[in-house]
């Protein structure tokens, strides 16, 4: 599966650029008639890091996804990417939710399901999330300068099966455009709070809470691909999967 994704992703990136105009026309007609919008995305990263934890053993990870939305604010989507910590080296995510604006505040609430083919049912889990964000123009600094802060809260009950901990995720970040350029800077800080396991001290000691942070520099579009480089770190994480480092990300949406 990983080889398939590695071979498929460059073809999807090239193909979506060639046919983007034609697809946009079809989707525009669909959205006008029904309020339904379709979106697709493909990406490649030199290292898949999830909340400070390596999912690809520092190997590259291609990914593809699709989104279906409605003018009411309801949406659903799927995503799959290559990982190395599963019997079948792929992760499949399915999510649905509701997004709207309340004045200047963007609100997003939903459910994200993580599925790992070949693993037991206990490995699969749900994450219920709430995201709040806004954009703050700073015209007194520069005409095209703004910052975009956000907060992301999530709860995953029984993280990996019965008699395993509940997990709370807290994440906050901010992105700032660099005036007069296509570049941007962003900073993210998060915490994974793992509850102690009830009645199982041995398992309780195998998982710890940890903090993580990312510092990213975005280059804007380079040859039609959104390009960025990120430094990541997970202070307090026990294990090699939390080692710090850099990764490069390429992506395209159509």
Cite the ranges covered by each PLM segment.
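Transmembrane beta-strands of outer-membrane beta-barrel pores
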Residues: 44-50, 80-84, 100-102, 113-117, ...
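Glycine- and aromatic-enriched membrane insertion/assembly motifs of diderm outer-membrane
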Residues: 57-113, 219
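Outer-membrane beta-barrel "beta-signal"
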Residues: 219-223, 241-254
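Short glycine/proline- and aromatic-enriched beta-strand/turn motifs that initiate or cap beta-hairpins
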Residues: 21-84
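Transmembrane beta-strands of outer-membrane beta-barrel proteins
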Residues: 38-42, 64, 74-76, 94, ...
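Detector for outer-membrane/organellar transmembrane beta-barrel domains
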Residues: 125-205
